[in-house]
Curated annotation (Swiss-Prot):
SUPFAM superfamilies (alphabetical): Nucleotidylyl transferase
NCBIfam families: arch_NMN_Atrans (TIGR01527), cyt_tran_rel (TIGR00125), PRK01153.1 (NF002243)
Sorted UniProt keywords: ATP-binding, Cytoplasm, NAD, Nucleotide-binding, Nucleotidyltransferase, Pyridine nucleotide biosynthesis, Transferase
Molecular function in Gene Ontology: ATP binding; nicotinamide-nucleotide adenylyltransferase activity
Record Gene3D superfamilies: HUPs
Cell compartment(s), UniProt: Cytoplasm
Family the entry assigns: Belongs to the archaeal NMN adenylyltransferase family.
Reaction(s) catalysed by this chain's protein: beta-nicotinamide D-ribonucleotide + ATP + H(+) = diphosphate + NAD(+)
Protein name: Nicotinamide-nucleotide adenylyltransferase
A Pfam family hit: CTP_transf_like
One Gene Ontology cellular component annotation held by this UniProt entry: cytoplasm
Gene Ontology biological-process entries: NAD biosynthetic process
């Protein structure tokens, strides 16, 4: 059996890792969708699709998990989004999502949809991790060490801080 899960993975953290590991116990292969792949260089989506692929690939490297990583664009046309996903991915039977819209769209197309159990959601939140990065607080223990390496390699902290800078034009 092959399953699909989509997320923004901004950044890929230990909560995401636990969900992927749990799904891998239930299916033979996982298709990991890089959602909103066209978005990057913003405070909510600071990392590119390629950087997120690096994070996930390196973090999963030590596990015996069969997976594909597929970038998925936002198309702002919900009625055809599932068809778009289907055209980009290998066939799959099951969708794992905690997102109510994604759940509804795939359910309407008769997919088996499961809601993964979130792993310590208060602690493992991309939003909170990005806030810690911005404030100069400790964030490294929330993500796999391979993700720390990628973020340091691409100067992800510097990028987030630069994105938060205010230009003089903002004050006039």
């Amino acid at each position: 059996m092959r399953a699909f899960i989509v997320g923004r993975w901004q950044p890929f953290h230990k909560g995401h890792l636990e969900i992927i590991k749990k799904i891998s116990e239930e299916v033979d292969e996982i298709i990991i969708g890089i959602g909103s792949c066209q978005r990057s260089h913003t405070l909510t989506d600071p990392f590119t699709a390629g950087e997120r692929i690096m994070m996930i690939t390196k973090a999963l490297g030590r596990y015996n998990i069969n997976y594909y990583i597929i970038p998925i664009n936002d198309i702002d046309f919900n009625a055809v989004w599932v068809s778009c996903v289907e055209s980009l991915t290998p066939p799959f039977d099951t969708v794992y999502t905690g997102n109510s819209l994604v759940r509804e769209l795939f359910s309407e197309k008769n997919y088996v949809v499961k809601k993964p159990e979130l792993y310590n959601r208060k602690e493992y939140s991309g939003t909170e991790i990005r806030k810690k990065m911005l404030k100069g607080e400790k964030w490294e223990h929330f993500v796999p060490e391979e993700v720390v390496d990628v973020i340091l390699e691409i100067d992800g902290i510097g990028r987030i801080k630069r994105l938060d800078e205010k230009d003089y034009d903002d004050y006039f």
